[in-house]
Regions:
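Helix-to-loop junction immediately C-terminal to a conserved catalytic motif
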Residues: 6
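ABC ATPase NBD Q-loop/coupling interface
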Residues: 15-37, 75, 191
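Conserved ABC ATPase "signature" region
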Residues: 22, 68-71, 77-95, 204-205
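Conserved ABC ATPase signature
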Residues: 100-104, 108
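A short, proline-enriched helix->beta-strand linker immediately N-terminal to the Walker B motif
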Residues: 119-123
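P-loop NTP-binding/switch modules centered on Walker-like glycine-rich loops
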Residues: 130, 134, 138-216
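Short catalytic/signature loops enriched in Gly
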Residues: 187-251
């Protein structure tokens, strides 16, 4: 879904709309020129900070590349100024800009990746498991940085994650997907305290807890996961749902 929103994957059915000011984009029907303008507003933070950065480029050149590709600057001096500004916001200093990616830890590389994503001032950012490849000790630092950038720059994030503790920390609204279909969507606090869908309840019950009274309360889902290529009819979760009814197979 995140890749389709950025037109990095084909949209096989349905529509994706994006509003920016007075302009409304139909993402699936964009021309090449419209797509170029759209990508100034919608960007992606990759999951793996080790694979996402060109090892032959300095950090300065990595961050500046979107500005040059999208023709957002006229001179190198203008590009340098924008790079320094966004680097500072992502907690990178001038010395960092002169180095190559191999000199940095995973958390530092992810900050470089975030700076590259934000240098063209997008409004919408897809963060695809952006802390999953990092040590737990580093994850909190990156999450706090993303939250700070969201508040300071007015960003909207589509934060994709399998880690519900991370989701609870950073998201305002949560959508739970099963076999490619959204089964429940609600404000974060409401979804975590009063889940409605059986799949959401099963996910939340599997979160590790230090409370000994909760030991053994995780719901064990029976049966094999159906193929997303040929999903079940009705509610896609009904083949594994402990409370499924006949109507679930149809609706």
């Amino acid at each position: 879904l995140g890749r389709a929103m950025l037109r990095a994957a084909p949209i096989t059915s349905g529509t994706i709309s994006f509003n920016h000011g007075n302009t409304k984009y139909d993402v699936g029907a964009m021309s090449k020129m419209e797509l170029k303008e759209y990508r100034k507003q919608a960007q992606l933070i990759f999951q793996d900070p080790y694979a996402a950065l060109n090892p032959r480029m300095t950090v300065r050149d990595i961050i500046a590349e979107p500005l040059e590709v999208m023709e957002l600057v006229q001179t190198r001096e203008e590009a340098d100024q924008k790079v320094r500004e966004i680097a500072s916001k992502c907690r990178l200093n001038l010395e960092h800009l002169r180095r190559f990616p191999h000199a940095f830890s995973g958390g530092q590389r992810q900050r470089i990746s975030i700076a590259r994503t934000l240098v063209c001032s997008p409004n919408f950012v897809v963060a695809d498991e952006s802390v999953a490849a990092l040590d737990v000790s580093i994850q909190a630092d990156i999450l706090n940085l993303l939250k700070s950038l969201q508040n300071n720059l007015g960003l909207t994030f589509l934060f994709i994650s399998h880690d519900l503790s991370v989701v609870a920390h950073i998201c305002d609204t949560v959508a739970v997907m099963y076999l490619g279909t959204i089964v429940e969507s609600a404000p974060t606090r409401s979804l975590f305290t009063q889940p409605k869908h059986p799949y959401t309840k099963a996910l939340l019950s599997a979160i590790p807890t230090l409370n000994p009274e909760d030991r053994g309360k995780a719901q064990k889902l029976e049966g094999e996961i159906p193929s997303p290529v040929n999903p079940p009819s009705g509610c896609r979760f009904h083949t594994r749902c402990p409370v499924a009814e006949d109507r679930c197979r149809k609706e």
